[in-house]
Amino acid sequence: MEQQVDVAIIGAGSAGLYAVGQVQRKTDSYVLIDGGELGTTCARVGCMPSKAIIQVAEDFHRRKLFNREGIEGADEMNVVPEDVMEHVQDLRDIFVDKVLSSSTDDMGDEFIAEYARFLEPNLLLVGDKKIRAKRIIIATGSRPVVPEAWQEFGDRILTTDDIFELETLPESLAVIGLGVIGLELGQALSRLGVQVTGIDQLDVIGQIDDPEVASIAQQLIGKEFPLW
């Protein structure tokens, strides 16, 4: 037996939840489908936990100005890596809980915690249930991919899905890819005492187009950790 709906939304991340809000203005015949981790990429493993660790790093980095401001004892301050990660994870959990409490937690039968696959253009198999929808919105997002040649290194390879699950900070870290995410995490971890090396095959960092700005950015970031 098939369930008939006007709209099926695959993916309960930021895009999928936004789609729900738009669909609800037009119809109450819809389902939201997601069999993976809930709470949005931004709140779980993206911009929110990254900003938490960036703030910790900025707070610690600022100790270098204390003597100038008449504050003594900066040289005796130190980072407790386990406490840093516990703090970041506590904030991350708060962010995720707030997302869930205002989205999927309030849904009834409209939310289905299963994976979907297409049987026909308008027919989905969701778990062991068939759902036919007049319209299907695909909002599955993306996830990091580890090249097959690198997989032999096992848990030495970290992605943005892994790094905020660490119980402590690594002693050293190579950041491969110096886009916005690589730069902000590389700088933050370097400021917290991790020996960071940045690696990118491009001649510019942060996708900066202006040659003069790109050159200055490389000089400034290069003072914090080496760039290859």
Feature locations, PLM:
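Glycine-rich flavin
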Residues: E2-V5, G21-D28, I33-L169, L202-G206, ...
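A structural signal for isolated positions on well-ordered beta-strands in alpha/beta enzyme cores
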Residues: A8, V31, A174, T197-G198, ...
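N-terminal Rossmann-like FAD-binding beta1-loop-alpha1 element of flavoenzymes
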Residues: Q4-L32, G182-R191
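Conserved N-terminal Rossmann-fold NAD(P)-binding element of oxidoreductases
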Residues: I10-G11, I33, I138, I176-G177
